[in-house]
């Protein structure tokens, strides 16, 4: 059974104050979101990891990945206005990916997790 994890990180961190959304706040030299990504990669390196980020955060995330030399394979889907919309967008992205992949059939397991919760 193929496994996927949608990591939803669309928040703006307004309640935290400051200019940096909480998913990008450094924790021991890496953004919180990177710790979450690494946690799921350690759990199952064959699981497909999909980050759901607002479009305007995606260039910043890609820059961070280059800066810290991210080795965890993942894809990015566009976030939505609310968590509900972000999860929906991630599931639609995944459905298209599975539908377009040749030879894939059978059951899949999809987990949805908040990007700012790295301690799973």
Model regions: which residues?
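Hydrophobic C-terminal alpha-helix "anchor/cap" residues
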Residues: 40-41, 65, 94
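N-terminal glycine-rich phosphate-binding loop and ensuing alpha1 helix
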Residues: 2-58
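A structural signal for short coil/turn segments at secondary-structure junctions
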Residues: 43-44, 69, 98
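Conserved donor nucleotide-binding strand/loop of the catalytic core
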Residues: 69-81
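Acidic helix N-cap motif at the loop->helix transition within catalytic regions
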Residues: 59-64
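Conserved beta-loop-beta/alpha segment of the NTase-like Rossmann-fold superfamily
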Residues: 82-120
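Structural motif
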Residues: 27, 52, 77-78, 113
């Amino acid at each position: 059974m193929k496994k996927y994890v949608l990591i939803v990180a669309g928040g703006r961190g307004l309640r935290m104050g400051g200019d940096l959304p909480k998913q990008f706040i450094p924790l021991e030299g890496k953004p919180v979101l990177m710790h979450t990504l690494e946690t799921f990669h350690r759990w199952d390196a064959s699981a497909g990891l999909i980050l759901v980020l607002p479009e305007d955060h995606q260039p910043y995330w890609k820059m961070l990945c280059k800066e810290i030399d991210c080795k965890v394979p993942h894809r990015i889907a566009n976030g939505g206005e609310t968590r509900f919309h972000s999860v929906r967008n991630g599931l639609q992205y995944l459905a298209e990916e599975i539908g377009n992949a040749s030879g894939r059939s059978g059951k899949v397991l999809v987990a949805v997790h908040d990007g700012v919760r790295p301690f799973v």
